[in-house]
Design a protein with these regions (language model features):
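Bacterial Sec-exported substrate-binding components of ABC uptake systems
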Residues: 1-26, 128-159, 267-291
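Mobile, glycine- and charge-enriched loop segments
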Residues: 2-3, 9, 19-21, 39, ...
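Solvent-exposed coil/turn segments that connect beta secondary-structure elements
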Residues: 6-8, 16, 25-26, 36, ...
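Short, solvent-exposed loop/turn elements at domain surfaces
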Residues: 11-13, 28-33, 47-51, 164-169, ...
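Extracytoplasmic/secreted envelope proteins and their assembly/folding machinery
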Residues: 14-17, 24, 28, 32, ...
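A short, structured surface patch at a secondary-structure boundary
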Residues: 19, 25-73, 77
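Binding-cleft/active-site segments that stabilize strongly anionic ligands or cofactors
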Residues: 52-110, 145-155, 161-162, 166-249
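Structured C-terminal subdomain patch of bacterial secreted/periplasmic proteins
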Residues: 215-291
């Protein structure tokens, strides 16, 4: 099978590869939803086995943090195929290709998610399941959007913690989902050809005053909380700051985006949508025989 990845590179991939290495959680997520267990995966934070993958990553060879995978450990896993996040691996393309056929996806925007899932499902020999997963998500997104209150549009922000928080434009996968539910993203849309995120100072945040803030949890270090402006934000005062799991960071996979949809709905409209049990939702999508 010959495919074109998000680098625009044409890759000859083996038929029904059995030994999948995942750089980022995207391919791990897709593989699990297809009933396949990868042989190697990166992590977001060492020792943090994400609930949206049912903690199953601890049974898989860990090959380092997603931004700096260890190529020696990757090679030891003897993969048939490597599925990677483009921006973290494009500089190592040559070394990766020596280990196994290397496929790179952007994994950044909701508009790319269906295509990435369907192509990877095809590569992994389960194209019908990929089509089903995409159709189910589109249906769920429409149902949740229809059920969301129409008279409120909570201002929201999705950010990586830091002294100057990095915030995500509306096309980014999680922000797209929150916006589809009626949220109003203070970071606004992407500029044509620009990046999918932007640095917003706490001063700017105070001016735009988000009512709900989703923070990608990079661990116990939360420098933004030490800034006196932080305490003045509406979201902080009303207790609507949510430190979210790794599925929000890696939301393009079928399991992650379904759970983000449910959590976002609950966090925006707690009266309308129930609290989410992440593991229970994940278990609906991960076949019993690989758990």
């Amino acid at each position: 099978l010959s495919i074109v990845d998000d680098r625009g590179a044409t890759i000859d991939v083996p038929a029904n590869p059995k030994r999948i290495a995942s750089i980022s959680y995207f391919a791990t997520d897709v593989a699990f939803a297809l009933g396949i267990k990868p042989v190697a995966t990166t992590y977001m934070a060492a020792g943090r086995e994400p609930d949206f993958l049912l903690g199953l990553t601890k049974q898989i060879k860990q090959i380092g943090q997603r931004a700096k995978p260890n190529l020696e450990l990757l090679s030891e896993a003897k993969p048939d195929i490597i599925i990677a996040m483009r921006r973290y691996t494009i500089g190592n393309a040559e070394q990766l290709q020596k280990i196994a056929p290397y496929v790179a996806y952007n994994m950044e925007l909701l508009s790319e998610s269906d295509r990435e899932i369907s192509q990877l499902a095809q590569v992994l020999g389960k194209p019908e399941r990929g089509t089903e997963l995409n159709a189910a998500f589109r249906q769920h997104l429409a149902e949740y959007s229809a059920k969301a209150p129409k008279d409120v549009h909570p201002r929201f922000q999705i950010m990586w913690a830091g002294d100057t928080p990095w915030s995500f434009h509306t096309e980014n996968t999680t922000a797209s989902i929150v916006a589809a539910l009626g949220g109003d993203n203070i970071a606004g849309p992407m500029r044509q050809g620009g990046p999918f995120g932007v640095e917003l100072s706490l001063e700017t945040m105070l001016e735009k005053d988000p009512e709900v803030i989703f923070v990608y949890d990079s661990g116990p270090d939360r420098p933004h909380e030490n800034n006196p402006i932080w305490q003045q934000l509406s979201a902080v005062k009303s207790g609507r700051v949510f430190y979210v799991g790794d599925h929000w960071v890696e939301a393009n996979g079928p399991i992650a985006r379904e759970i983000v949809l449910r959590e976002a709905a609950h966090y925006l409209y707690p009266e309308t949508f129930p609290k989410v049990d992440v593991k229970a939702e994940a278990a609906k999508l991960i076949p019993a025989d690989i758990r």
